[in-house]
Amino acid sequence: MALRRPMVAGNWKMNGNSALAEELFKKFATKLQNDSAEVVLCPPSIYLESVRQLLEANKQTLDGALVRMGAQNLSQHDFGAYTGEISGQMLKDSGCRYVIIGHSERRRMYGETSNIVAEKFAAAQKYGLTPILCVGESGPAREARRTFEVIAEELDIVIEKNGTMAFDNAIIAYEPLWAVGTGKSATPEQAQEVHAFIRSRLSEVSPFIGENIRILYGGSVTPSNAADIFAQPDVDGGLIGGASLNSSEFLSLCTIAMSA
């Protein structure tokens, strides 16, 4: 069985400020003492520099811990007249290692199709960023027993456009749309069932990737349910929304992941 290091990625969405980042790093210094889990902060782009400076300033106190920086989105284009967009090259230059791709809110609110998501996936890897690819089904799709079908389609378009080996440097986040921001989480058994399907699907085209890729769960994860979810054999941590804005809750989730 592969030894996959758990990851806890905090997606602040359009929330937070420099003070939140400073508060988190103060707690990181005393609570994160080893590298048994990887922690990723994904603040709004305007705060990336603040987080980068804090990473640099706390390098010694965080010695031994794995704290990285990620972005919430990027353009599929390299450069040009795309007002308000940020390229993969810019994110890499800012110090990002990761970038969230295809979050359900981007797909739903901003019309990002699976084709666009696949292009953004490629753009991230072109500049040495590791994409955190979000996949997941809506409530009606789950009720219609189409969960696996929807997720297979979202994975297959990325494979079709980028090749199977693109997942050798990628993270997948399963985020059931009916659980995102609703306070209603999937049960540990539901999460495991879908994560196992994702791993099996990728194993069909590459057993190595299927075994080694990290798959996060995202959808109303809290300190009260994280231990049971993270304990599932195919769950490798979480993509955290609301709880990432509370430094105590987020640190609790990191600690839980370290012992999962």
UniProtKB/Swiss-Prot annotation:
It catalyses: D-glyceraldehyde 3-phosphate = dihydroxyacetone phosphate. GO terms for cellular component: cytosol. Substrate binds at residues 11-13, 181, 220, 241-242. Homodimer. Pfam families: TIM (PF00121). Belongs to the triosephosphate isomerase family. It comes from the Bacteria. Pathway: Carbohydrate biosynthesis; gluconeogenesis; Carbohydrate degradation; glycolysis; D-glyceraldehyde 3-phosphate from glycerone phosphate: step 1/1. The active site is at residues 103, 175. Involved in the gluconeogenesis. Catalyzes stereospecifically the conversion of dihydroxyacetone phosphate (DHAP) to D-glyceraldehyde-3-phosphate (G3P). One of its GO terms (biological process) is gluconeogenesis. Keywords: Cytoplasm, Gluconeogenesis, Glycolysis, Isomerase. This is Triosephosphate isomerase. Its main location: cytoplasm. CDD domains: TIM. GO terms for molecular function: triose-phosphate isomerase activity. It is found in: Cytoplasm. Its EC number is 5.3.1.1. PANTHER family: TRIOSEPHOSPHATE ISOMERASE.
